Design a protein with these regions (language model features):
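Bacterial N-terminal signal peptides that target proteins for export
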Residues: 1-11
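A general, composition-driven signal for non-globular sequence regions
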Residues: 3, 15-17, 70-73
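Bacterial N-terminal signal peptides
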Residues: 9-19
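Exposed acidic/polar residues on beta-strands and adjacent loops within beta-sheet cores, strongest
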Residues: 24-146
Length: 146
């Protein structure tokens, strides 16, 4: 096999591996089964209300609903990263009521990787991680996210 074919196959395999570990974007408004209970995202006058059952636990401005979800072993959502007009918002459904953490920086999220308690985001402004409410811009490194 030629070196070019070997290199091409390795590149394709790497791309497939990367895509399988990145979490896809969803626009589901609900019902969404989470560890905290059933969640709905209802449109209101300026954006959306995040409802756990019949109680609103957050409101955010957004033209459209977009979120990246992490599913637990039983298939229910454990965490979700919401795309809002003011930047990403992390909902941690492992707690009841859900923990809400705002990134505090306007950016458009393209891909999300869940790493323990941190969420790593590829955005239009570069790579960032959100951990315990702190947003950090990531520098080039050899760490692999999957």
């Amino acid at each position: 096999m030629s070196p070019l074919k070997t290199c091409l196959r390795a590149a394709i395999a790497s791309a497939v591996l990367l895509v399988t570990h990145a979490h896809a974007q969803s626009d589901a408004a609900g019902p969404v089964a989470t560890q905290a209970g059933t969640v709905y995202f209802l449109r209101d006058e300026s954006g959306f209300a995040a409802m756990l059952g019949t109680q609103a636990f957050d409101r955010f401005d957004a033209r459209r609903l977009a979120h990246f979800d992490e599913a637990g072993s039983n298939g229910s959502i454990t965490r979700a990263l919401m795309q809002t007009d003011t930047g990403p918002v992390l909902y941690d459904f492992r707690r009841n009521p859900p923990l809400v953490q705002r990134a505090g920086k306007r950016m458009t999220v393209q891909r999300v990787f869940w790493q323990g308690d941190e969420v790593v985001m590829q955005t239009t402004a570069g790579w960032y991680k959100l951990e315990r409410g702190a947003l950090t811009k990531l520098q080039s490194s050899t760490k692999t996210y999957h």
